[in-house]
Amino acid sequence: WWMSVVRKERPEMTTRGLPKGLGHNPSADKFVPEELQRMIEAYGNHPSFTMLCIGNELGNSNFDIMQQWIKSLQEKDPRRLYAISTARKIMPADQYMVTHNIPQTGGTYGINGSGTDNDRESIYSKATIPVIAHEVGQYPVYPLWNEIDKYTGVLEARNLESLRQQAVKNHIEHQDRKFHEASGALQTILYKGLIENLLRTPSCAGFQMLSMTDYSGQGEALVGWLDSFWDSKGIITPEQFRCYSNDIVPLARFHKYTWQTDETFKAQIQV
C-alpha cells in the first residue's frame, strides 16, 4: 500500500521522485563518489573485494554521471569488476551485470517446460560480460498468525494483522497452518527448479535472491523460508537446501516428470 499513498510527513516512503536519484541530488552526488574512492583505498587489497556496484535498481538516477564515477574507479584500481547498478540499465563501462533481463535478448531466470532438460544458455551465451540473475524466485509462503506475537515494544505487525483480518472475514483464519505447509512445499519445489535451471546454464555467472528471510520493508514480502526474525518456518532444513544450492550439485536432465509404466526412464547426468 505504501507505493500508492502519498505521505507528506514521510517522503522517503514514496518512490515517485523522492528521494531524488543519484546525479539529481546535490548532497548525495558529492558524497557517493568520494565514498567510493574511500572504499577502494581502505579495502582495495582485501582478497574478497572482487566486485563493486554503486547500488541496487537505481532507475531514477543519471546513468551518464554514475558511469563517470565508475570510470574513475576503473582507472584508479582496475583489479576488480565494476558495475553501475543492478537491473534497470546496462552501460558501456559495466564489466558485469546483475539483472532480471538482458536487453534485446531475454529474461535471466524462469522455469521452462515440464521436465528438467532445459536451461537458459541461449540467452546467457549472447552476453559479452558476466551476467548474474537478479532477485530470483520471490515465491511467497502463507503466514502463520502466531508470528504476530513476536512483534513487541515499538514493533507492530500491521501487515500481518491486515492479512489475518481478511482471513477472519473469509472464515479461513484457522487454516493458516495448512496453507503455510502447502505453500511452503510449493516454494521449495519452485526454488529447487529455478536454481537447478541456472546451474545447468554454463554461461550463467551466478544468481542472487531477494532474501532467504521475509522482507517487511515494503509492506510485506513473504518470500523467505525463514521469517523476518530469521527463525525457520519449518519448510526446509539447511541440509536439504544445500542438496540443490551448493558448490557442487548433481543434476539430472529429463524431458518430463510423469512417466508411464510401459516407458523407460531416461536421463542425462550433469555435474
Q: PLM features: residue spans?
A:
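Substrate-binding/catalytic cleft of secreted carbohydrate-active enzymes
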Residues: 1-226
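Aromatic-rich peripheral "rim/lid" segments of glycoside hydrolase catalytic domains that contact
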Residues: 72, 76, 210-270
